[in-house]
Amino acid sequence: MSLLTEVETYVLSIIPSGPLKAEIAQKLEDVFAGKNADLEALMEWLKTRPILSPLTKGILGFVFTLTVPSERGLQRRRFVQNALNGNGDPNNMDRAVKLYKKLKREITFHGAKEVALSYSTGALASCMGLIYNRMGTVTTEVAFGLVCATCEQIADSQHRSHRQMATITNPLIRHENRMVLASTTAKAMEQMAGSSEQAAEAMEVANQARQMVQAMRTIGTHPNSSAGLRDNLLENLQAYQKRMGVQMQRFK
């Protein structure tokens, strides 16, 4: 795997699924291919994106700044600086300085990533902030190692919380989670339907699922009533795709 492919993989792993993720993936591809040279426009676009956490925006802003050539005098952006200040915790800043000194001695992406993984997310963010604010310099490879270590830690904590959701036994939470997943799947079906001849059929299935979820939420139902709702929806989607001649590998 090439360095930029690895960076793209790690960065995208912390972004929630949806149309925005696809848009960000395209921006990263363009930036890494040298097709987008307007850093200021890119940062303005990033600043106004909804859904993303400040830290995620900070990491993306850091990656864009590392990759897109810019004039030396270009101002640093406040929204990135605020996101990469380690929550203003002096302990994070102390650890970030120690980490920075170690990173100065590293020359490879993997070496930097290994060193960085032993630090907390707050310290890693603060260290990115040091480099972003030009208070310290490391090679681009080492900076990318720092980025990927940070993303790995964030993705780990997200994965733990997803696992907890999967093992949760509270029927009310499981019921709501199934309905949320059904709504999300319905939305994906509508987006995939596009303008094909059978699109109306897919839209109809998705619409019915939405209405069912809405009705369940409005009148209140037994927590078991949503069991199988998302699976039924996925079966409908797979049947629709087979007729379209599209083989769906994995959609769960």
Curated annotation (Swiss-Prot):
It comes from Influenza A virus (strain A/Chicken/Shantou/4231/2003 H5N1 genotype V). GO terms for cellular component: host cell nucleus; membrane; virion membrane. Plays critical roles in virus replication, from virus entry and uncoating to assembly and budding of the virus particle. M1 binding to ribonucleocapsids (RNPs) in nucleus seems to inhibit viral transcription. Interaction of viral NEP with M1-RNP is thought to promote nuclear export of the complex, which is targeted to the virion assembly site at the apical plasma membrane in polarized epithelial cells. Interactions with NA and HA may bring M1, a non-raft-associated protein, into lipid rafts. Forms a continuous shell on the inner side of the lipid bilayer in virion, where it binds the RNP. Most abundant protein in virion. When expressed alone can form virus-like particles in transfected cells. A motif (Nuclear localization signal) lies at residues 101-105. GO terms for molecular function: RNA binding; structural constituent of virion. Homodimer and homomultimer. Interacts with NEP. Binds ribonucleocapsid by both interacting with genomic RNA and NP protein. May interact with HA and NA. Cannot bind NP without genomic RNA. Residues 165-252 are annotated as: RNP-binding. Belongs to the influenza viruses Matrix protein M1 family. GO terms for biological process: viral budding from plasma membrane. This is Matrix protein 1. The keyword Transmembrane does not apply. It is a peripheral membrane protein. It is found in: Virion membrane; Host nucleus. InterPro entries: Flu_matrix_M1, Flu_matrix_M1_C, Flu_matrix_M1_N, Flu_matrix_M1_N_sub1, Flu_matrix_M1_N_sub2, INFV_M1. The gene is M.
